[in-house]
Amino acid sequence: MSVFCLQAKPTTVEILEGIDKDIQILEDYSVKYQRQMKAVVGRLLLYSILLYLMAGVVVYSWYLPEQLMGRLVLGLPFLLFPLLVWILRKVLILFFARRTEKNNFKLEDLKAQKRKILEDVMETETYKNAKLILERFDPESKKKTDFDSTPVGPQMTPKPGQELRHRNVVPQTPPASVNSASGAAARPPLASGPAYPGRSSHSAPGGPPERNLLAIAAQQSLMRKFVTPGTPIPGVGLHPPGPPLARPVLPRERGVLDRLIEYLVGDGPQNRLALVCQQCLSHNGMALKEEFEYVAFRCAYCYFLNPARKTRPQAPRLPETAGEPKLPCDLNSSSCAAEEDKQSDSGD
């Protein structure tokens, strides 16, 4: 009979449930202690101020003695009363702080005990039971393990300023060329080659490569059709082949130190002007206000040469002084002979 009277050993779930209840109770006690401390200290200060003012008014109105010594003796409690209130406030704060500290110690012990039980569960229980227990009593670690086990694919993040440089250039071509581009898109193996036999797909160094852009656009449209969403497409959003930007594009997100340096030096986006191509209206960087009128650049997207708005003025040539050494000249030259004649005439 004694064997049947023995209580059954509590399971892991029951132990964890009891620990969770105790943790919740202790957390509620911590919040309760904080509220009680604020309420008690606030009431103490409020009642003390009201009592101090009422006592001062009553004593000043009816019980104020005429002698100086009596006034000093009567004013002594008014000087000691604020000190007494301050000491009482400190005692109350210390009392509630000790209770909160003991409560926190118990709370930390229960959390450590729960953590140890969960570690034992992962080692002793089966996968199914351990998963259910973790989902119920430790959802944060479960989410963390699921996040770590989930493979994260590479993401293509644009560099600072790259979103300003990415423009879609659509050249204006007749309908026949559009049809040929669509036909080239229908035949993927021929899209990378030249569009017409006997002609090169590269144009002159100064002109825009229309056929090359058409082939790239057709290839990108074909890749968008057969690629699933979320898969990075190579070559999309990158800088096109060609000359670099005339001036760099300043990033939007700048720190406090960068803004301070820009303010001291006089640099920054507010002190620069954008270099916009006259043909395709693409952004080619930002130049300083002093050099904006004199910058000539080739567009990095359509390769159009944008001339400078003004010609930089050149300083006048300095006049030659008498003390400068003269270059040696040939005696047989006519110029040297003329100079010698002038010198002889002046000597006469």
Swiss-Prot record:
Membrane topology designation: Multi-pass membrane protein
InterPro entries per the UniProt record, alphabetical: Lnp, Lunapark_Znf
GO CC, one annotated term: endoplasmic reticulum membrane
Zinc finger (C4-type) residue numbers: 277-302
Region described as Disordered: spans on this chain: 142-211, 313-348
Biased composition regions of type Basic and acidic residues, renumbered to the chain: 339-348
Keyword Iron-sulfur: no
Post-translational modifications: Phosphorylated. Phosphorylation occurs during interphase. Phosphorylation also occurs during mitosis; these phosphorylations reduce both its homodimerization and the ER three-way tubular junction formation.
Residue intervals passing through the bilayer: 44-64, 68-88
Keywords, ordered alphabetically: Coiled coil, Endoplasmic reticulum, Membrane, Metal-binding, Transmembrane, Transmembrane helix, Zinc, Zinc-finger
UniProt superkingdom: Eukaryota
GO biological process, one term: positive regulation of endoplasmic reticulum tubular network organization
Main location: endoplasmic reticulum
Lumenal side: 65-67
GO molecular function: identical protein binding; zinc ion binding
Compartments where found: Endoplasmic reticulum membrane
Keyword Transmembrane helix: yes
Segments forming a coiled coil: 105-126
Cytoplasmic side: 1-43, 89-348
Assembly: Homodimer; homodimerization requires the C4-type zinc finger motif and decreases during mitosis in a phosphorylation-dependent manner.
Domain notes from UniProt: The transmembrane domain 1 and 2 function as a signal-anchor and stop-transfer sequence, respectively, generating a double-spanning integral membrane protein with a N- and C-terminal cytoplasmic orientation. Transmembrane domain 1 and 2 are probably sufficient to mediate membrane translocation and topology formation in a N-myristoylation-independent manner. Transmembrane domain 2 is sufficient to block the protein secretion pathway. The two coiled-coil domains are necessary for its endoplasmic reticulum (ER) three-way tubular junction localization.
Function: Endoplasmic reticulum (ER)-shaping membrane protein that plays a role in determining ER morphology. Involved in the stabilization of nascent three-way ER tubular junctions within the ER network. May also play a role as a curvature-stabilizing protein within three-way ER tubular junction network.
Family under the similarity heading: Belongs to the lunapark family.
Protein name, as recorded: Endoplasmic reticulum junction formation protein lunapark-A
Species this protein is from: Takifugu rubripes
Taxonomic lineage: Eukaryota, Metazoa, Chordata, Craniata, Vertebrata
Recorded name of the encoding gene: lnpka
